Amino acid sequence: MKLYVISNSNIMADFILDEFKDVPNVVQINFKQRKNALTSALKWIRLKMGNPRGLFDDTLFEKKFLDEISKIQPEDKVLLWSIENLKNTMLIANEIRSKDIQSFLWNPMLRVRRNNSAEEYKRKIKEYGIGLSTFDPYDSKMLDCRLMPQVHRAVEMPAIEHPEFDVFFVGQLKGREEPMSRLIKEFRDNDISYFFHLINGRHDTGDVAPEIKECIKDELMSYPETLANINKSRCLLDLTQKGQQGLTLRPIEAMMYKKKLITNNSAIKNEPFYNPDNIWILDDPDEKRSVADFMKNVPYTPVPADVEQRYHIRPWLDALWHAPVASAK
């Protein structure tokens, strides 16, 4: 029996699943969606015809992908990782022979929420016999599916005696300007150093405050560089997008690399690793400390190892299947 992980090709999924590069019974397959007017039409036609296996395969899928999934046997386990699009899920599920398919939703299902299509999503997933799980509590209730912890992979980092800056953030603006601007002003007033690498993207930088604009860069930061900057910092900043209750990767990185965390996600109080010594929640009515007090006067408290392990990819996969599918060394 093998475990096949079929994932949307992205930097973070590839980094996490690289944990298994030397594990022969865990195989990663990248799915790159072909998205154009023709493939959209062919998907619609194929699904209307009952989703017959093989129909329009040469147009819908890359040959390499088809070759890789053809090796999957009925007794193998398959995890669809972050393939949230329902049509893609149904097409892939009908192409593989596995009798044990799980789908992990790694993004908030905002489109399903907007379109009020949760019932159709649940019905189709059940029809295809797919086990469904998510990291987001709201989506877990909406889709009546299993709630799993956020998941990551830790790597060894060189010891740094003196951090270069207090607070580190990397990411897109995505409407985060107001809380970010407030924090920057408080950092400056209290001599708290920070390094923010903000991605311009489609955002109009002409409307943002000067303290935000000066942090905007034209190029993405690679994940190895992100890890290096995490290592150089004392605290990570986590600002979730509107509508997301599940954790981003920032809190997990903070825990794994023993950094403090500033976040606007009050749902983090429900996590077993939550400790107010380590985590300061923006705009939380129960938070009586200033961010300066939190940064300067409260020592970090390490998270118990058994708690931290719940968020590591190997035990996480074992927990998903209630079996040791990924624990081989």
Label each region the model flagged.
Residues 1-98, 102, 106-108, 329:
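N-terminal pre-catalytic "stem/leader" segment of glycosyltransferase-like enzymes
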Residues 84-188:
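Catalytic core of nucleotide-activated saccharide and alditol-phosphate transferases
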